[in-house]
Amino acid sequence: MTAQNIDGKLISQTVRSEVAARVKARTQAGLRAPGLAVVLVGEDPASQVYVGSKRKACEEVGFVSKSYDLPATATEDELLTLVDQLNEDPEIDGILVQLPLPAGIDSTQVLERITPEKDVDGFHPYNVGRLAQRMPKLRSCTPKGIITLLDRYNIDLRGKHAVVVGASNIVGRPMTLELLLAGCTTTTCHRFTKDLEGHVRQADVVVVAVGKPNFIPGAWIKKGAVVVDVGINRLESGKLVGDVEYDVAKESASFITPVPGGVGPMTVASLIENTMIACEQFHSK
């Protein structure tokens, strides 16, 4: 058995096309296009690449993309003042502050300052809390993108034992909540977990988000399991690999996300979708 690759590039393009059609319908009806504000502090090269791809995706679907690039010397107060201005801007539906922020700026303070109805990253405690209470509005982009991928491949999650490896606020924790909502029995593994191998070997669905190349040996994957690899790691050779030993894992899995081209494109697609939802549901009065 060789796993079927889950094509994140294809599904993300489908999602973007669907959003573009909704934008076109809005503008043809005389309504404004959705607006996304992207805030970058400092000159971190990886952040610049991510921000560039998000801005490009916005423009492709017909959004109004507004860029705010602050120097690395910007203070927390300056950033909070900008967030306050964007919260009040009637043409901005979504506010994205690119992480990580420079030392000296409290990212929790900044993310909590974004009004929940413009929190298109889905990081605000209000939005995470709504997901926990089975009433999601704006959902964390990467977990939402993963659920979209599994849904588009008609993978039924109800009753499955799902194991999430990694417990970050950005992926692991909201992913656990998403899988719970989808009807899974969920286990979250983290740095204090004993017998990680035992947990992974039992999993019908494995989601790995730890940021360590080939962290999960392919031999741990149960026959027929669905493997979602969130990691993207560059080896010294320049090759990009995930957190799961792909070549071995694909021999046992039924479905697997490749790296690159699996989960990554869906994060941006979910951001686009969240901005559309924010515009339609919260700011079209």
Swiss-Prot record:
Residues annotated for NADP(+) binding in this entry: 166-168, 232
Entry keyword set: Amino-acid biosynthesis, Histidine biosynthesis, Hydrolase, Methionine biosynthesis, Multifunctional enzyme, NADP, One-carbon metabolism, Oxidoreductase, Purine biosynthesis
Record-linked Pfam families: THF_DHG_CYH, THF_DHG_CYH_C
Cellular component GO terms held in the UniProt record: cytosol
CDD domains: NAD_bind_m-THF_DH_Cyclohyd (cd01080)
Source species, domain of life: Bacteria
E.C. code: 1.5.1.5, 3.5.4.9
Keyword NADP annotated: yes
Pathway annotation from the record: One-carbon metabolism; tetrahydrofolate interconversion
GO biological process, one term: tetrahydrofolate interconversion
Gene Ontology MF: a single term: methenyltetrahydrofolate cyclohydrolase activity
Catalysed conversion reaction: (6R)-5,10-methylene-5,6,7,8-tetrahydrofolate + NADP(+) = (6R)-5,10-methenyltetrahydrofolate + NADPH; (6R)-5,10-methenyltetrahydrofolate + H2O = (6R)-10-formyltetrahydrofolate + H(+)
This protein's record includes keyword NADP: yes
Quaternary context: Homodimer.
Function as written in the Swiss-Prot or TrEMBL entry: Catalyzes the oxidation of 5,10-methylenetetrahydrofolate to 5,10-methenyltetrahydrofolate and then the hydrolysis of 5,10-methenyltetrahydrofolate to 10-formyltetrahydrofolate.
Family stated for the protein in its record: Belongs to the tetrahydrofolate dehydrogenase/cyclohydrolase family.
Protein's name in the database: Bifunctional protein FolD
Species whose genome carries this gene: Vibrio atlanticus (strain LGP32) (Vibrio splendidus (strain Mel32))
Gene, per the UniProt record: folD
